[in-house]
Design a protein with these regions (language model features):
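Short, structured segments at the rim of ligand-binding sites
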Residues: 1-169
Length: 169
């Protein structure tokens, strides 16, 4: 049991239809419990640092995801709500911020869909969590993507790029 607010990611994954199991040594394994992940509702007010990762998850869920708590995002390393919407839109992900304190994300229609890149030049805005979330979302892009200021990940996860390469390639 973690005291970290970010542990709520487990609940979000389950709401999306993921199967989450815990192993020894704090190992967490995530797989699809259903044929495809589905849009979900989640209140991230108490865990605002999860928004970038939740946006990446929602991009690959069928249907609409509603994340609450966006007012907590304006004073992070970047205005995270606006940054997430701007950078993910370059990947073809529709994010609506017009509802008060909500981020509404329209996911891909089928699990075989890839992201249709509109602009292959993303920017982390020197925000480590934005850099990691856009990198993960870019794995399903229909063409190569570059992320400016990608070294921002060094703030919290210096091994991120090596670990992502090992997991994905």
């Amino acid at each position: 049991r973690s005291l970290q607010a970010d542990r709520a990611i487990v609940d979000a994954l389950k709401r999306a239809g993921a199967r989450v199991t815990f192993g020894s040594g704090h190992l967490l394994t995530v797989g699809c419990a259903e044929e495809r992940l589905r849009g979900f509702e989640f209140d991230a007010t108490d865990c605002p640092d999860l928004f970038p990762a939740l946006a990446a998850l929602a991009a690959f869920c069928e249907g609409v995801t509603v994340l609450r708590g966006t007012t907590r995002l304006t004073h992070k390393e970047s205005d995270r709500a606006a940054t997430i919407a701007a950078e993910f839109s370059k990947l073809g992900v529709s994010i609506d911020l017009s509802q008060e304190d909500r981020m509404v994300i329209r996911g891909l229609s089928t699990p075989d869909d890839g992201l249709t890149v509109r602009d292959a030049s993303l920017d982390s805005h020197n925000d480590h969590r934005i850099a990691m979330a856009t990198a993960v979302a870019s794995l399903r892009a229909d063409r190569p993507v570059t992320i400016s200021n990608a070294q921002a990940v060094d703030k919290s996860y210096p091994q991120f790029w090596n670990d992502l390469k090992q997991l994905y390639y």
